[in-house]
Every structure is written in structure tokens, then in C-alpha cells.
């Protein structure tokens, strides 16, 4: 399965104090789009968070997530490369690719 498109919507987190940097939509093989992947700045650097929902007991569960570490790494690397391409001023972020 190939990533054929990545769309990033940057969030103005500097004024709000939020750790959320952007929302991402990834298209696979021009036939499936995965929306609401989040780019988050955490204590140990920047990471992606998969779409999730809140359960009745208040826990958050992923709606979809990578099964293998290799796929997660490839997805994260592709998202980070596109994020930096669109936002070169954010090069100082600790991105793990």
C-alpha cells in the first residue's frame, strides 16, 4: 500500500499553548483516505497520534492504527517530511525520521 497524498492543516498552537501542531489526512493508493491524524509536540519530541474516540467510561481508543512498527515508522516519516516541506520555519522541532 503506497501513500499517494498527504494533506496537512497546521494549527496555530503558539497563541493557544496547545501541543497540537497539525491535523493530517493521508491517502493510500488513491482509494482510501485516513483523516484526523494529529501531529503533537510532546516532552520527548514530535509524534503522530492516530484518530481516536472517547468511550463511555472516558478512555480514548484508536479507531485505526498501524499493526507493525515498520509501517508506523514509514507513515510518521512521510508525514514529517511533508510537514517540514510545507513549514520550513519549524525545522527546529525534534522530528524522529
UniProtKB/Swiss-Prot annotation:
Belongs to the SpoVG family. GO terms for biological process: division septum assembly; sporulation resulting in formation of a cellular spore. This is Putative septation protein SpoVG. It comes from the Bacteria. PANTHER family: SEPTATION PROTEIN SPOVG-RELATED (PTHR38429:SF1). InterPro entries: SpoVG, SpoVG_sf. The gene is spoVG. Keywords: Cell cycle, Cell division, Septation. It comes from Borreliella burgdorferi (strain ATCC 35210 / DSM 4680 / CIP 102532 / B31) (Borrelia burgdorferi). It holds the Pfam family SpoVG. Could be involved in septation.
Amino acid at each position: 500500500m503506497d501513500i499517494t497524498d498527504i494533506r496537512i492543516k497546521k494549527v496555530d498552537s503558539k497563541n493557544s499553548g496547545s501541543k497540537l501542531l497539525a491535523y493530517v489526512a493521508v491517502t493510500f493508493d488513491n482509494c482510501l483516505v485516513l483523516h484526523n491524524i494529529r501531529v503533537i509536540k510532546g516532552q520527548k519530541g514530535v509524534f503522530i497520534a492516530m484518530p481516536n474516540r472517547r468511550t463511555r467510561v472516558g478512555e480514548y481508543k484508536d479507531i485505526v492504527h498501524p499493526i507493525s512498527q515498520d509501517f508506523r515508522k514509514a507513515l510518521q516519516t512521510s508525514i514529517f517530511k511533508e510537514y517540514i516541506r510545507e513549514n520550513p520555519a519549524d525545522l527546529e522541532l525534534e522530528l524522529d525520521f
